[in-house]
């Protein structure tokens, strides 16, 4: 094994040679890549720590840190291994025995439709394991609140999507103490920690929204909380959890066909970006309803915010210590 010493690192840098990896590239376009193992100002112990954190992230369902480690630290291409099909597969289920000894958090997530709501309740452990508790389609705001109380969920831990009928959602959040959420096309959001470090996460900092905007009471009532969540990142994580490629994620034994169908309501499609590189995006499958899928995405986001998963979804910007 090599020791992380200045003379050894310098010897590595002096003895290295550049290799052509794409002989078909135009002669007027030249690019270079090298591993962070080479520069003497990058400590190997930091690279080892980054790699171990990335491997730990895989155990709870996300490839984001490993992708950053391979592409940004090692300078090697990332190869997507996620399937793009929408074929229905049997979901993992639990024994429906309660109380669950490992439960640390319980969230309700709600998708708003014209005439009804989709509501999902899921229990989470601190290490990212989770169990579906309940799902249903309440008809009124009051029904949603009754279910929150029935399943013993704190008001601010009920997260409701505000993309549709936002003004009524804001009013309901003010009335009942709920929290708003909204999906975003962004892959991550900037956060500044108390120590001044800059990090990027799959959800935004809290945004305060005036529930009375556009009315005479605008600016005179207490604002409600809103969090944006990354559509691409969170859906990638949920996919991995659903496929058993992370922490334990289970449904009820009698979740039903509608729940199962909607959990396979979106799939990833590949397209080429302007540079000709493959980009993967989530798309709805035909006219298949995806409301439960969205509720489960908000569950993943809530788990990140509660730090059941958060540690492994934090990407420290290069040059920062965290």
Question: Each predicted region: which residue ranges?
Answer:
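Hydrophobic, well-ordered secondary-structure elements that form the walls
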Residues: 111, 158, 295
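Acidic two-metal-ion nuclease catalytic site recognized across multiple nuclease folds
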Residues: 304-322
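Short acidic, Gly/Ser-rich segments with clustered Asp/Glu that frequently serve as metal-coordination loops
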Residues: 112-116
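Short cysteine/histidine-rich metal-coordination sites, predominantly Zn2+-binding motifs
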Residues: 2-27, 311-316
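Mg2+-dependent endonuclease catalytic cores in nucleic-acid-processing enzymes, primarily RNase H-like
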Residues: 1-3, 13-14, 33, 63, ...
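Extracellular low-complexity, Gly/Ser/Thr-rich intrinsically disordered linkers
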Residues: 30, 34, 39-46, 50-55, ...
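Active/binding-pocket-proximal capping segment
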Residues: 123-127, 313-316
């Amino acid at each position: 094994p090599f020791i992380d010493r200045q003379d050894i690192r310098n010897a590595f840098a002096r003895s290295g040679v550049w290799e052509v990896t794409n002989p078909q590239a135009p002669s007027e376009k030249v690019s270079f890549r090298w591993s962070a193992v080479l520069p003497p100002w990058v400590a190997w112990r930091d690279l080892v720590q980054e790699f171990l954190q990335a491997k730990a992230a895989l155990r709870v369902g996300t490839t984001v840190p490993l992708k950053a480690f391979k592409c940004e630290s090692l300078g090697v291409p990332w190869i997507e291994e996620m399937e793009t099909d929408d074929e229905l597969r049997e979901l993992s289920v639990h024994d429906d025995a309660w109380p669950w000894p490992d439960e640390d958090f319980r969230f309700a997530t709600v998708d708003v439709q014209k005439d009804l709501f989709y509501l999902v309740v899921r229990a989470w452990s601190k290490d990212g394991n989770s169990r579906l508790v309940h799902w249903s389609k309440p008809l009124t705001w009051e029904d949603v609140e009754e279910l929150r109380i029935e399943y013993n969920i704190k008001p601010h831990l009920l997260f409701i999507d505000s993309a549709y009928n936002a003004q009524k959602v804001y009013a309901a959040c003010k009335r009942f103490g709920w929290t708003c959420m909204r999906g975003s096309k962004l892959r991550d959001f900037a956060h500044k920690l108390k120590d001044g470090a800059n990090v990027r996460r799959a959800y935004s900092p809290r945004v305060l929204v005036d529930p009375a905007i556009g009315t005479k009471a605008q600016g005179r009532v207490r604002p409600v909380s809103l969090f944006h969540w990354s559509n691409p990142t969170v859906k990638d994580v949920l996919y991995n959890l659903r496929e058993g490629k992370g922490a334990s994620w289970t449904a009820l034994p009698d979740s039903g066909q509608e729940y199962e169908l909607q959990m396979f309501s979106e799939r990833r499609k590949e397209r080429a970006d302007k540079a000709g590189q493959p980009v993967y995006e989530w798309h709805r499958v035909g006219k298949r309803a995806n409301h439960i899928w969205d509720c489960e995405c908000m569950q993943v986001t809530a788990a990140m915010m509660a730090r059941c998963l958060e540690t492994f979804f934090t990407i420290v910007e290069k040059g920062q210590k965290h």
